[in-house]
């Protein structure tokens, strides 16, 4: 049995019968967790264990757990800094910022792995132009090289803990003001302008071995009329062929307003998969998930299944939290990360991405 091309969410802190029915469907290959799915560490570990036990080929479990405003699990987890705080340190001490970024990635990933989560949709590789409120302090910096250096360090820290990284939002969401959760943003720059700036960290992260990518629900009309997540130009010609990316591609949530361009939910899923996504996310609308499961008919290629299988967390890096706390590596990382950026994080804890998933 192999992973299907759909990633769905679940209703609460434990699986209900409808969750089990949906997740057992052959089309489903993953689950994304939200803050509503978390009560405490023991409950999360039990939920992940039950999800993984549903199929012979365990479902992928992913989460948006970046730090700052976007951290689904808080009580019982280390409060991670907003990535902009690492960029501020970079301005004065680049090497120190890289070290802290790697430690942040390690703490992020090791705590998630200890509870059974396979991967986080992180790091954010968008540039901080100061225009986008939905990106904002989720971005490391305005300088493409700084974003790459810090993003690579976070990725390496995640790898140290047995977790693959997923960069987002290809080819860059930071320049537009509109929020793709509630609108369809349009970036009217030329491909040359984008390639000289926003594409740089994505290109360098591909060269550094990034395992997965999430495209933006943004239209770049000078390149293609389709939003990037539905565009064969962006996903096949540029990402796969020109940049040489051979990792997994996850759509952003296809229930967001930025995805409405492609039609109804079944049409959105088909369009995303046809464009080059390996897994399509359908979140926060169980009735739409049921519609997709009833109507979607896809011939799922073996290379896509293989790319997704590489996103499973490494089993050798999944100690219990008790064992993790006794680890010298974790203790050292925690010493550096705990409290980092706390002042800026506490100014605004409203999650700009969790419109329907907020507990």
UniProtKB/Swiss-Prot annotation:
Keywords, comma-separated and alphabetical: Cell cycle, Cell division, Cell shape, Cell wall biogenesis/degradation, Cytoplasm, Glycosidase, Hydrolase, Peptidoglycan synthesis
Record SUPFAM superfamilies: (Trans)glycosidases
Residues reported in the UniProt entry to bind substrate: 64, 72, 138, 168-169
GO biological process terms, semicolon-separated: carbohydrate metabolic process; cell division; cell wall organization; peptidoglycan biosynthetic process; peptidoglycan turnover; regulation of cell shape
Cellular component GO terms held in the UniProt record: cytoplasm
Keyword Cell division: yes
Chain positions of site Important for catalytic activity: 179
Example of a GO MF term: beta-N-acetylhexosaminidase activity
EC category: hydrolase
InterPro entries, sorted: Beta_hexosaminidase_bac, Glyco_hydro_3_N, Glyco_hydro_3_N_sf, Glycoside_hydrolase_SF, NagZ_Beta-hexosaminidase
Entry's EC annotation: 3.2.1.52
Main localization of the protein described in the UniProt heading: cytoplasm
Reaction catalysed by this enzyme: Hydrolysis of terminal non-reducing N-acetyl-D-hexosamine residues in N-acetyl-beta-D-hexosaminides
Associated pathway: Cell wall biogenesis; peptidoglycan recycling
Localization: Cytoplasm
Active site: residue positions: 181, 252
Family note: Belongs to the glycosyl hydrolase 3 family. NagZ subfamily.
Function: Plays a role in peptidoglycan recycling by cleaving the terminal beta-1,4-linked N-acetylglucosamine (GlcNAc) from peptide-linked peptidoglycan fragments, giving rise to free GlcNAc, anhydro-N-acetylmuramic acid and anhydro-N-acetylmuramic acid-linked peptides.
Name listed for the protein in its UniProt record: Beta-hexosaminidase
């Amino acid at each position: 049995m192999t992973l299907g091309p759909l990633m769905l969410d679940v209703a609460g802190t434990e699986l209900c019968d409808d969750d089990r029915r949906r997740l057992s469907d052959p089309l489903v290959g993953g689950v994304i967790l939200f803050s509503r799915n978390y009560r405490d560490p023991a409950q999360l570990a039990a939920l992940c264990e039950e999800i993984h036990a549903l199929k012979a080929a365990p479902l992928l479990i992913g989460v948006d757990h970046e730090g700052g405003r976007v951290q689904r699990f808080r009580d019982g987890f280390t409060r991670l800094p907003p990535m902009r705080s690492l960029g501020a340190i970079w301005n004065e001490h680049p090497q120190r910022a890289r070290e802290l970024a790697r430690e942040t990635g390690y703490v992020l990933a090791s705590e998630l792995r200890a509870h059974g989560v396979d991967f986080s949709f992180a790091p954010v590789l968008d540039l901080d132009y100061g225009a986008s409120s939905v990106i904002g302090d989720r971005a490391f910096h305005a300088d493409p090289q700084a974003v790459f250096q810090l993003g690579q360090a976070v990725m390496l820290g995640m790898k140290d803990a047995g977790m693959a990284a997923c960069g987002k939002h290809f080819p860059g969401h930071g320049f537009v003001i509109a929020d793709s959760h509630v609108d369809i943003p349009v970036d009217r720059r030329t491909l040359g302008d984008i390639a000289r700036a926003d594409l740089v960290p994505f290109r360098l992260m591909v060269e550094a071995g990034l395992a997965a990518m999430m495209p933006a629900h943004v239209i770049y009309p000078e390149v293609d009329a389709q939003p990037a997540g539905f565009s064969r130009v962006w996903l096949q010609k540029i990402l796969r062929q020109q940049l040489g990316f051979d990792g997994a591609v996850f759509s952003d949530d296809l229930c967001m307003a930025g995805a409405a361009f492609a039609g109804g939910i079944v049409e959105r899923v088909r369009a995303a998969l046809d464009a080059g996504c390996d897994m399509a996310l359908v979140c926060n609308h169980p009735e739409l998930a049921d519609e997709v499961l009833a109507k979607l008919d896809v011939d799922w290629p073996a290379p896509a299944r293989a790319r997704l299988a590489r996103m499973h967390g490494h089993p050798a890096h999944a100690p219990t939290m008790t064992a993790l706390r006794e680890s010298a590596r974790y203790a050292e990382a925690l010493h550096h990360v705990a409290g980092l950026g706390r002042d800026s994080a506490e100014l605004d804890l409203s999650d700009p991405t969790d419109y329907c998933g907020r507990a």
